[in-house]
């Protein structure tokens, strides 16, 4: 697909196990800032989506104030972001307090920053944990055999510091130009950030 010149998102997904691949996305979110070219958020149970082999470029938000490339908002978990090319995207790969996200084998060029991880559920967004997030978890049949086999992390998430952004991996990416590391200090202890190549200007 070729998705471009749009006022808001290019792709929004909900649910599980989607494949979002081989899209050319540019000049979207032209009238938006707290938005993403590819967006989902605020549900621990929406897992298994793979975002791969996409080209995302010139995505900077309304009046260049900044938006997001892949926006995993408000504790979204279990998503893979692999093999994408980002050029001139603000917050190209953003993990908004979620866990079990893999960002691997992507190329970031002139992004500000290339990667972002925060621990929002442990501070300013903590009110979602015992309300929206818990309610949506309880609505799903996570103890049924199919769910338990496919998403075993959901069986223990409520007892395992559910607000902590655990299990995130950012590795084997390449960053040229722009800013590489937008990981917040309160989230840094929870991330495996390794084997990335950041080119010097």
Model feature map: region roles:
Residues 2-201:
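Glycine- and acidic/polar-rich repeat regions and solenoidal domains
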């Amino acid at each position: 697909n070729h998705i471009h010149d749009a006022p808001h998102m290019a792709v929004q997904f909900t649910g599980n196990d989607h494949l979002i691949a081989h899209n050319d996305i540019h000049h979207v979110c032209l009238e938006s800032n707290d938005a993403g070219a590819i967006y989902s958020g605020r549900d621990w149970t929406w897992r298994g989506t793979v975002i791969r082999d996409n080209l995302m470029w010139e995505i900077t938000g309304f009046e260049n104030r900044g938006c997001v490339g892949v926006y995993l908002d408000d504790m979204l978990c279990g998503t893979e972001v692999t093999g994408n090319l980002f050029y001139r995207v603000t917050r190209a790969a953003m993990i908004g307090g979620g866990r079990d996200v893999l960002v691997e084998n992507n190329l970031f060029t002139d992004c500000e920053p290339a990667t972002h991880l925060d621990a929002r559920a442990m501070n300013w967004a903590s009110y979602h944990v015992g309300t929206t997030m818990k309610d949506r978890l309880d609505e799903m049949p996570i103890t049924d055999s199919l769910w338990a086999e496919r998403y075993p992390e959901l069986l223990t998430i409520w007892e395992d510091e559910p607000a902590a952004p655990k299990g995130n991996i950012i590795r084997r990416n390449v960053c040229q130009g722009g800013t590489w590391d937008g990981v917040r200090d309160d989230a840094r202890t929870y991330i495996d950030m390794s084997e990335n190549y950041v080119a010097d200007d």
